[in-house]
């Protein structure tokens, strides 16, 4: 469970599965010791079996480059968590006010089929969110300013051994 978001609700929203189908699958996952009895949190074994990919950006106006980058990020793992920059961070990055609020951008990104969960980032420190999500892979867009070395070193400081992958420029 991340920021109060129940994973079962995400599954219901993003799939055409019926409630009884979801319940049956969750029961199977509990029997395999992948999901806890509360039906919403993963066991350590379950957590280790999923490859979580974290991607981030401003996402003020979604364009084909965003879609390409998010599709490439999703292909790297099982769960794609996307972090939308706060309004203040967006101003610092883009040197202008965003057209859409951080909540609107979160809602828009969360509506994309490829995205499993979208969060609003933390002010000033990207590693607060990274520590919270604990991804195995951090996906960077081809045009993002962050350097792989900076991300790798920041992850080490929070005891996270995440791989960093940068997508190629869309042609």
Describe these PLM feature segments:
Residues 1-171:
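Nucleotidyltransferase catalytic core that binds NTPs
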